[in-house]
Amino acid sequence: MIQDKSKGAKQTLLERPWFLAVALAGLIGGAMLITSFIRATDNTLSLCSTAKNTAASIAKYTATPIQLQSIVHYATSHTVPQQSFEEISISLNVLKERLPCNFLVFGLGRDSLMWASLNPGGTTVFLEEDPEWIEAVLKDAPSLRAHHVQYRTHLSEAGRLLSTYKNEPMCLPAKAFPIRYNEKCPLALTSLPDEFYDTEWDLIMVDAPKGYFPEAPGRMAAIFSSAIMARNRKGDGTTHVFLHDVNRKVENAFANEFLCEKYKVNSVGRLWHFEIPNAANMTDQPGDRFC
């Protein structure tokens, strides 16, 4: 998220702070206008009919309050998301196919208003470990649904956790669920709000917690718990998991261990996109390993 910035190259969007406002405005009216125009012919009656249909379509469409707030926010701010346009587009394409959906985002930032506005009618929830940061973000975007999270891990423990988790039976995929009560596995997120456990998430974005200094929580538990929730999905379809900052060693290693290379369907910049089936559809997968 915005708060957890890497020291890499500057994002191209930083030079175009007006870009998201234009894009969001286009989402509201552009698709309907284009659809109407491509059907128009030189026939006068057809043109009149098309104009009437276009006006009716626009009149019927009502932007949600959070979409309108998002347009104004990004049109009047120099703050843009940390992710590049290409990275955002990967998630946006899935959102367009699945919305309205249940969208869980690890991390809260100046881009959170954008993510919520891209899921109109759906449920978008943000998890953040810094209570002061939550207060700062919600001051400008009070409509966001954000929860404070306390993690049990530290980035300095990543190597040990990765090499020893198999020694704890409750960390294995066959026994790790439900993670709400799984105190024996240090990678399980056990102290989250009820909404986290009671909702079946269609999309999960892991772009937090902090993971760039030893005392930080790291994203180990977020990645592990995302994999467990995806494997235990009860509804139809797969769970889409997006992991940002895969250029970092811990994110890369834990993604390969728990999200699995064979489920990776897209990769651009520092973002990996996984499409994970539930355990019932993993006919070739034993219960003692993830990949």
Curated annotation (Swiss-Prot):
GO terms for molecular function: glucuronoxylan 4-O-methyltransferase activity. It comes from Arabidopsis thaliana. Its EC number is 2.1.1.-. Disruption phenotype: The double mutant agm1 and agm2 results in the absence of methylation on arabinogalactan glucoronic acid side chains. The lineage of its organism: Eukaryota, Viridiplantae, Streptophyta, Embryophyta, Tracheophyta. Disulfide bonds: none annotated. It is a single-pass membrane protein. PANTHER family: OS11G0490100 PROTEIN. Involved in the methylation of glucuronic acid of different plant cell wall component, but mainly on side chains of arabinogalactans. The chain crosses the membrane at residues 18-38. Belongs to the methyltransferase superfamily. GO terms for biological process: plant-type cell wall modification; protein methylation; xylan biosynthetic process. It is found in: Golgi apparatus membrane. GO terms for cellular component: endosome; Golgi apparatus; Golgi membrane; trans-Golgi network. Its main location: Golgi. Pfam families: IRX15_IRX15L_GXM (PF21729). The keyword Methyltransferase applies. NCBIfam families: A_thal_3515. This is Arabinogalactan O-methyltransferase 2. The gene is AGM2. Gene3D superfamilies: Vaccinia Virus protein VP39 (3.40.50.150). Keywords: Golgi apparatus, Membrane, Methyltransferase, Transferase, Transmembrane, Transmembrane helix. It is an enzyme of class 2 (transferase).
